[in-house]
Amino acid sequence: MRFSKAVVRGRVAILILTVLLMIPAVFGMLETRINYDMLNYLPDDMDTVIGQNALLEDFGKGAFSFIVVENMPEKDVAALQEKLESVEHVETVLWYNSLMDTSIPMQLLPDKLYDAFNTGDATMMAVFFDTATSADETMDAIREIRSIAGKQCFVSGMSALVTDLKDLCEQEEPIYVAIAVVLACVAMMLFLDSWLIPFVFLASIGAAILLNLGSNWFMGEISYITKALSAVLQLAVTMDYSIFLWHSYNEQRAIYPDKCEAMAHAISATLTSVVGSSITTIAGFLALCFMSFTLGRDLGIVMAKGVLLGVLSCVTVLPSLILLLDKPLQKTRHRSILPKMDGLAKGVTKVFPLFLALFVVLAPVFYFAYDKTNDEVYYDMGQCLPEDMEYVIANSKLSEEFDIA
């Protein structure tokens, strides 16, 4: 109770401190680098990582891309090659004139060599960079190559995929976070007993999410998967804590007329229930840190940190906001559309052997379904990207015209 009473007494100071902490949190979030290269999360002793490091250190070649050029005269392709070679961090551009002078007709080449560069009205060149696949410099070079090459050229390769993936995530992340917030608001306004309380919850959880994203700065960088998932996951995982505090506060208000005393007891009751649950959740996320594929560590640390900040916000920021807005919250109360579940609860406890038997019967069915789902797991990121994305179009042309997947 000592902690609970301290929160109630210092509610104004807590809110002021939270607002002040938002400033460095925003800067930290903006300065945290987002990593789009899954190779960075593989163990250093894997052949792929060893090979990439050897190429970069011994030969000065890191990332590479294939460029398919359609319906362009040979002299224009040669001019394009010269322009691409001048792009910063482009180490080498390989095409026909890397082997022979363009004054010598391509048709004089042996068929096997000619077919390696040409098919129909299309020709192909390979671009090698002196930086890693997902380095910021490589992505900038990909964008510059696309702007130089024009609509007749299609840039494929892992670096092109990473560049498009970054642009797509930055474009769509605010959209699906906004959708999650709107849906959560609508659901809570309908199923809780106040029209205003969902927005109070979101303010409290939003502060915790922002602090979590800002504190990622100390990690140096996070993966794009972590960035894409963390905000929505944190919202979903910690929302229950806020609902529990609100229900506990309303129950205590019926016992204690003074709102501050009621809130102190509500915080104490919430801590008792939420701490055990949150520790289990945090432990589950931290278990990801033991994966050899260190994306698990990346996601595990960020989400464990998010749950911890969510709990702290639930028992400090949220009570302060509720006490500050107590009058409008009480005025906007309404009947919940959810019916009482007492009858259902009693019914379930009476026939619980039936549910146990049902579980035993269905478990093998769902295990079989799970096993079949594992057969369909894919690891090609290109399969989950929109068909009109530049990388997907370029990769399709490379596969169809040059039989390079």
Could you say what each language-model-derived stretch is?
Residues 1-34, 133-379:
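Membrane-embedded transmembrane helical bundles of large multi-pass transporters/channels
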Residues 35-66, 72-79, 92, 353-405:
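Juxtamembrane segments of multi-pass membrane proteins
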Residues 45, 49-50, 75-131, 163-167:
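Extracytoplasmic
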Residues 46-50, 95, 140, 160, ...:
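A general alpha-helical scaffold signature found inside nucleotide-binding enzyme cores
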Residues 64-70, 123-128:
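Active-site-flanking beta-strand signature of metal-NTP-handling nucleotidyl enzymes
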Residues 69-71, 97-99, 157-159, 362:
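A general secondary-structure junction signal
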Residues 79-90, 141-153, 397, 401:
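Generic non-transmembrane alpha-helical segments
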